[in-house]
Amino acid sequence: MKFDDLRDFIGQLEERGLLKRIKQEIDPHLEMTEISDRTLRAGGPALLFENPKGFDTPVLTNLFGTTQRVALAMGQDDVAALKEVGKWLAYLKEPEPPKGIKSLWEKLPIFKQVLNMPTKKVRSPACQQVIMEGDDVDLTKLPIMTCWPGDVAPLITWGLTITKGPYKKRQNLGIYRQQLLGKNKIIMRWLSHRGGALDFREWQEVNPGKPFPVSVALGADPATILGAVTPIPDTLSEYAFAGLLRGSRTKVAKSISNDLDIPATAEIILEGYLQPGEEAPEGPYGDHTGYYNEVDDFQVMTVTHVTHRENPIYLSTYTGRPPDEPSILGVALNEIFVPILQKQFPEIVDFYLPPEGCSYRMAVVSIKKSYPGHAKRVMFGIWSFLRQFMYTKFIIVCDDDVNVRDWNDVIWAITTRMDPSRDTTLVDNTPIDYLDFASPVSGLGSKMGMDATNKWAGESDREWGTPILMDKKVKEKIDDLWQDLDILS
């Protein structure tokens, strides 16, 4: 199913009973977070707050609060079907020419979808129906949520930040949180390895001291939003991937104050620049770890223009101890990771990022083990293959008889197939999430790999245990008798 814009998606969710309109007056300061959090933990609907206290603009939260809604936003019926999206990305990351008629036929759906990758330019976009600039710009009029009692200021959480470096043809779209500083100032909190930060550094190399143009889209269509959080190849534009997801070309328009392309159907657009050297302390904020983060200096964005649709909707979220919206997205995106990893490492059977691990800090993987040391190869392969796993602190590798999504199975494998000294690999001085205060140095820490596989000759000199399995014929006989025995009724 295709969704041309956020409003189209809202309408479809409402028809399915997956969106609830809140007509009571609710304060964006803390109250919306509490309602959204209770709703998400109960597996409830997306929420449209129609009467935010002190503001005229309605607020949409919990949009991706269930894996079902994430799948729908990606044009799929359920989360399991997202593996097909992963297969597209695996192919686009390392394309192979068809090896015959059968191969051509199998790849035909991908080739057809590629036609939707180029963007479509729009001259009079909906996102520029209302234009404000200069003294008319006032970000304090937006119902920006303050999510937790210790948060220093209101925080923009779903800002789709658009940048372009001097060396790349494509633009970068990334989601970075943005602290409200004043009427026309926000802090751009991006980590040094993220696309926007890389573009900014390269810009300063070529244009020292000159302002760096930036546009921020709030409330883009769901395919474009999810394109910015999906592990696409570095050479692929998020707009192009959104076209693949949507099944139609992404509509973009030129920003008013710069040459950046913005989502034409977005609800609200912020345009402006980063002046090199202008920084401000960011935070503290409650984050997806369940803790408040440290205060650190980040670049300040000066907003020169605000454009929006008539009667815009403000898209927002909160982050906190899982489950929250980022962790739900992580569960859904997990299905996309599996085919990408399997293309590089065919021995991988399954891969799982437990949501309790704050989306990416722990991974459990099962493999068809083929030789001594195989588990260690897979550990280092995962850490280095995709940028998303640079910050994964713990990787547990199991055999293919272990269900990596069942902690009962995983803990059994750890406790019966591991020796803590022999089967634990520690790596020092590796990149770690800036928000990880447990690391000894900000942004730098260690990683642990755990080999919970059966050990082969060369890995252990002892006779290895054989798992207990019931005789197959006995199981079949009892299967036939089970209902008649009437034991559990």
From Swiss-Prot:
Its cofactor is prenylated FMN; Mn(2+). One of its GO terms (biological process) is ubiquinone biosynthetic process. Its EC number is 4.1.1.98. Keywords: Cell membrane, Decarboxylase, Flavoprotein, FMN, Lyase, Manganese, Membrane, Metal-binding, Ubiquinone biosynthesis. SUPFAM superfamilies: FMN-binding split barrel, UbiD C-terminal domain-like. It is an enzyme of class 4 (lyase). Mn(2+) binds at residues 172, 238. Binds 1 prenylated FMN per subunit. Prenylated FMN binds at residues 175-177, 189-191, 194-195. GO terms for molecular function: 3-octaprenyl-4-hydroxybenzoate carboxy-lyase activity; metal ion binding. Pathway: Cofactor biosynthesis; ubiquinone biosynthesis. It catalyses: a 4-hydroxy-3-(all-trans-polyprenyl)benzoate + H(+) = a 2-(all-trans-polyprenyl)phenol + CO2. It is found in: Cell membrane. It comes from the Bacteria. One of its GO terms (cellular component) is plasma membrane. The active site is at 287 (proton donor). It holds the Pfam family UbiD_C. It is a peripheral membrane protein. Belongs to the UbiD family. Catalyzes the decarboxylation of 3-octaprenyl-4-hydroxy benzoate to 2-octaprenylphenol, an intermediate step in ubiquinone biosynthesis. Homohexamer. This is 3-octaprenyl-4-hydroxybenzoate carboxy-lyase. The gene is ubiD.
